[in-house]
A protein has these predicted regions:
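N-terminal and secondary-structure boundary signal
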Residues: 1-292
């Protein structure tokens, strides 16, 4: 059984976002349930490309600011980071609004440059490497964006942790996984379970439908979700936008591997009732090959 909190939030107005995040996290027991006071915490955002927040390609900076403020109240030292496939995070952080949040709230921007082998000796990908910089933090809070994904269907909490692979190494691991999407999904699940973010907060105020994860259309969804189990929160998002979970590769892989909560019946909802959300006609994306 996993707890998933889900609350309504209609706009990226900072006051509204802050109120919604407070309600979201309080319903799960408060931020102190996930981090210790004074911890070094990484906010793992989604910076696919250095695009403006209005494009909905990246985690919205209002979400990042709101979460950072919750952590700062708990005397945490907050860092913001990701590893885009092209360029550096610090180089793109300003375009996406992350650098401005860091300056305003007193956070630090961190690049992922060096790789270290993940302890995954019992997994399918025993030698997978992730950014060594993530070892510097006491906790990681995962901040994905609800977007369609041309190869995997949706990109959510589990997939977002692939950003902890150093950018220059991403192509190598894509090629190592090959063109079998179920096999690639197992790698994504192993990265997620190996890193173990303490909390996943999913930005679904305005998501992306259609030709995601970069060229789709912004779609107002009006929701923020949080859970310590990204598989569970991804499952809830799939139901919200009418994706059959068994057709999403990461959810299918997680269920097969016994990681996370795989059935909606095994989720305890917090915040607001799941039945109060009605998202219709969310435009899916035609799936393409993993080949480059």
């Amino acid at each position: 059984m996993s707890d998933v909190s889900i609350v309504k939030c209609e706009e990226y107005n900072q006051e509204e976002v802050d109120r919604s995040l407070e309600k979201l996290i309080t319903s799960l027991g408060g931020i102190q349930r996930f981090v210790k006071e004074g911890s070094k915490v990484l906010l793992k955002v989604n910076l696919l490309f250095p695009r403006a927040p209005s494009s909905m390609v990246t985690t919205h900076p209002a979400i990042v600011e709101g979460v950072a403020k919750l952590l700062k109240k708990y005397k945490c030292e907050v860092f913001i980071g990701d590893s885009p496939a092209i360029g550096s995070f610090s180089g793109g952080a300003s375009a996406a609004g992350f650098a401005q949040v860091a300056d305003k709230i007193g956070c630090k921007i961190v690049d992922f440059n060096k790789s270290v082998r993940l302890n995954n000796t019992s997994g399918v990908f025993k030698d997978i490497e992730v950014a060594s910089e993530i070892q510097d933090f006491d906790a990681i809070v995962n901040l994905p964006k609800v977007k369609t994904h041309g190869q995997m269907g949706l990109t959510l909490g589990v997939k977002n942790m692939f950003g902890c692979v150093v950018g220059t190494k991403k192509l190598y691991w894509h090629l190592r996984a090959g063109i079998n999407k179920d096999y690639f999904a197992k790698m994504l699940v192993e990265i997620y379970s190996g890193i173990k973010p303490v909390l996943t907060i999913t930005d679904g105020i305005t998501g992306m439908e259609g030709n995601g994860p970069q060229w789709g259309r912004p779609r107002k969804l009006g929701v923020i979700l949080a859970s310590s189990d990204a598989v569970a929160s991804d499952l809830v998002v799939a139901h919200l936008v009418n994706y059959a979970p068994e057709k999403l590769f990461t959810l299918r892989a997680a269920k097969e591997m016994g990681i996370g909560t795989a059935r909606i019946e095994d989720i305890k909802f917090r915040g607001e009732p799941f039945s109060s959300f009605d998202i219709v006609d969310f435009k899916k994306v035609p799936l393409s090959s993993l080949e480059f």
